[in-house]
Amino acid sequence: MVTKEDVLNALKTVADPHMGISIVDMGLIRDVEVDDEGNVKFKLIPTNPYCMSVMAMAFQAKEAVKSLEGVKKVEVTVEGHVMEKDINEMLKEKE
């Protein structure tokens, strides 16, 4: 079974392209949830509401978690960005 720690470790492999620091270490990941069926949810909150890299980071984060054995579905929600509605729609389309 996948744990919250497994998810955070996978997310540590994703770095902010401008800072070169993992999105976990930067504090951009919140509310990680893992259920017994392997469904994972978490929020990505960029440091600035106009961050141009948030889409790339969100897709990389989703793929990093999807690659974990036992993960069935990954739901990433971007919050605090001026285009969060559009970004979240695109993230859902790529399932």
Curated annotation (Swiss-Prot):
Disulfide bond sites? none
Top-level taxon of the source organism: Archaea
Name the UniProt record assigns to this protein: Uncharacterized protein MJ1129
Taxonomy of origin reads:
Archaea, Methanobacteriati, Methanobacteriota, Methanomada group, Methanococci
